[in-house]
């Protein structure tokens, strides 16, 4: 596996499967432990750099590092020299000089994680960089935790039909999921209004549809995306109500799904817009399972980058 995780395209099928397998092993290793600590990353320093708001991703990376006995340090724009005008490059070089083993970055600019990896590259002692979401580009660990959730719920991913619904244009989650699910052998369908699909989307390894009702009966899983109004400068649809009527997963639409189908959402959810509260809280919803899996997947990613897949994943 490469030294960084910048995009889901970095992962081969074997590498992705190894991470998912180790995530399951970490989950099992922690069951029944009064103190949730493994010595896997003892003596390692993990620094999180979050320049956008986050709850699930930031907390799960922090928990993952601490459960593996790493020293985890949080750097935010408001609490660092960034607030004084320091550039991302100078911040990155400072953290490398301070001895960071891993830098986990979330940033509003697409390509920020790649830049960070290039800036901190060195012949020896360069930190591993993990992309925790860069603008509208990618979010590879979210795709991994979604894949783990699907594998647990469905028994496998190969040949499964996954329908991704909503604001694909602004969604780094959608991009990473398309790449990873394709790598793992799933069939991916994108459902969105034409205004919320990227240019060139028909060259992606997906089927594109604008009719959600037509796609639900054959779906093994549905991944609902939030409308990212904070990234929109104009009108992408007539109204929130009309969007919800056409592309929201309502109780009525849930009835179109097979009983075995799984409902995913990367969060945060806009209940009543892209998903109803009753669907979000139903037995088909795997939203909280996704959160739990996020910790275990990020443990596995840190292990693969910092320790190496050739070593035993779990030390009792």
From Swiss-Prot:
Q: What metabolic or biological pathway is this protein involved in?
A: Pyrimidine metabolism; UMP biosynthesis via de novo pathway; (S)-dihydroorotate from bicarbonate: step 2/3
Cellular component terms per the entry's GO annotation: cytosol
Instruction: Report residues binding carbamoyl phosphate.
Output: 56-57, 106, 139, 142, 267-268
Q: What GO terms describe the biological role, i.e. biological process, of this protein? A: 'de novo' pyrimidine nucleobase biosynthetic process; 'de novo' UMP biosynthetic process; amino acid metabolic process
Query: Which EC class heads this enzyme's classification?
Result: transferase
- InterPro entries associated with the record: Asp/Orn_carbamoyltranf_P-bd, Asp/Orn_carbamoylTrfase, Asp/Orn_carbamoylTrfase_sf, Asp_carbamoyltransf, Asp_carbamoyltransf_Asp/Orn-bd
Q: Kindly indicate whether the keyword Disulfide bond belongs to this entry.
A: no
- The organism sits in which domain of life? Bacteria
One example of the protein's molecular function in GO is: aspartate carbamoyltransferase activity
Binding positions (L-aspartate): 84, 172, 226
Entry's EC annotation: 2.1.3.2
Record flagged with keyword Ligase: no
Keywords recorded for this protein, A-Z: Pyrimidine biosynthesis, Transferase
What this protein catalyses is: carbamoyl phosphate + L-aspartate = N-carbamoyl-L-aspartate + phosphate + H(+)
- Protein's job: Catalyzes the condensation of carbamoyl phosphate and aspartate to form carbamoyl aspartate and inorganic phosphate, the committed step in the de novo pyrimidine nucleotide biosynthesis pathway.
Summarize subunit and interaction data from the UniProt record for this chain: Heterododecamer (2C3:3R2) of six catalytic PyrB chains organized as two trimers (C3), and six regulatory PyrI chains organized as three dimers (R2).
Q: Which family does it belong to?
A: Belongs to the aspartate/ornithine carbamoyltransferase superfamily. ATCase family.
This one is known as Aspartate carbamoyltransferase catalytic subunit
Q: Which organism is it from?
A: Mycobacterium sp. (strain KMS)
Taxon lineage: Bacteria, Bacillati, Actinomycetota, Actinomycetes, Mycobacteriales
**Gene that this polypeptide is encoded by:** pyrB
């Amino acid at each position: 596996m490469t030294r960084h995780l910048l995009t889901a395209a970095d992962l081969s099928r074997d590498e992705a499967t190894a991470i998912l397998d180790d995530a399951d092993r970490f989950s099992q290793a922690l069951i029944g432990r009064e103190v949730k600590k493994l010595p896997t990353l003892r003596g390692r320093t993990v620094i999180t750099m979050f320049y956008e708001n986050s709850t699930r991703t930031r907390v799960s990376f922090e928990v993952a590092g601490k459960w593996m006995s790493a020293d985890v340090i949080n750097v935010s724009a408001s609490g660092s020299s960034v607030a004084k005008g320091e550039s991302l490059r100078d911040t990155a070089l400072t953290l490398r000089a301070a001895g960071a083993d891993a830098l986990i970055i979330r940033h509003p600019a697409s390509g920020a994680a790649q830049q960070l990896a290039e800036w901190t590259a060195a012949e020896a002692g360069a930190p591993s960089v993990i992309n925790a979401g860069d603008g509208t580009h990618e979010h590879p660990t979210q795709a991994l935790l979604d894949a783990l959730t699907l594998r647990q719920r469905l028994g496998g991913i190969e040949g499964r039909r996954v329908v991704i619904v909503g604001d694909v244009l602004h969604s780094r989650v959608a991009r990473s999921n398309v790449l990873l699910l394709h790598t793992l052998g799933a069939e991916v369908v994108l459902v969105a209004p034409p205004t919320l699909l990227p240019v060139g989307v028909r060259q992606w390894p997906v089927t594109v549809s604008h009719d959600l009702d037509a796609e639900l009966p054959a779906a093994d899983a549905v991944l609902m995306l939030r409308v990212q109004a904070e990234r929109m400068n104009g009108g992408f649809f007539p109204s929130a109500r009309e969007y919800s009527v056409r592309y929201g997963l309502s109780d009525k639409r849930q009835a179109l799904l097979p009983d075995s189908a799984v409902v995913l959402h990367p969060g945060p959810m806009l209940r009543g817009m892209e998903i109803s509260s009753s669907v979000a809280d139903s037995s088909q919803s795997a939203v909280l399972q996704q959160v739990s899996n996020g910790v275990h997947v990020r443990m596995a990613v840190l292990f693969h980058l910092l320790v190496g897949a050739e070593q035993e994943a779990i030390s009792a």
